[in-house]
């Protein structure tokens, strides 16, 4: 099963195309109902590979934030907050973990070029599986809740300020 969780309309179009063109395995598209903005550099090739860099900080990155779907935008906002603390976070959109992990090592290293200890995954779901990609994982390892989106983001620690705070605590030194 090829699971794809796109972050914007371009990634969604690419995911749909890949699903329709696939002759060897089924595809699950995990879409949001949120009205999300458009990434500046989303690409078919990035979705095809499973992951690619979508945001570069103002100075050389010393950490990478890896996210899927709507969390990509939360990571971009958190990255901008982190710059004030001199933590420079590059953001990677990983719409398809399945596609990414089967790439040759040299292709994976082009995307995840920083050391394992400098990577953080951000996923509004289980952190299960992310340990193979990132040392630090921000997720929800409990049952969800019902309510307004803004209230739930705050409750589970997924506002950009809360994400930036967690990341800062990982890299205190």
Enumerate the language-model features and the residues they cover.
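Mobile "lid/hinge" segments at catalytic clefts and subdomain interfaces of large enzymes
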Residues: 1-2
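Thiamine diphosphate
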Residues: 12-15, 19-173
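A short helix-loop
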Residues: 5
């Amino acid at each position: 099963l090829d699971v794809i969780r796109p972050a914007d309309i371009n990634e969604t179009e690419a995911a749909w195309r890949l699903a329709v063109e696939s002759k060897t395995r089924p595809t699950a598209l995990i879409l949001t109902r949120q009205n999300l903005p458009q990434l500046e550099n989303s690409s078919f090739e990035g979705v095809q590979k499973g992951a690619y860099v979508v945001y570069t900080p103002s100075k050389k990155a010393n950490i990478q934030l890896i996210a899927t779907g709507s969390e990509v935008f939360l990571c971009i906002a958190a990255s901008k907050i982190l710059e004030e603390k001199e933590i420079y976070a590059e953001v990677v959109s990983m719409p398809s973990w399945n596609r990414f992990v089967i790439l040759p090592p040299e292709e994976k290293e082009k995307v995840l070029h920083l050391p394992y200890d400098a990577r953080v995954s951000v996923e509004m779901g289980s952190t299960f599986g992310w340990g193979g990609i990132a040392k630090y994982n921000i997720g929800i390892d409990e049952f969800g809740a019902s309510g307004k989106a803004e209230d739930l983001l705050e409750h589970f620690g997924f506002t950009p300020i809360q994400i930036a705070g967690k990341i800062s605590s990982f890299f205190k030194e």
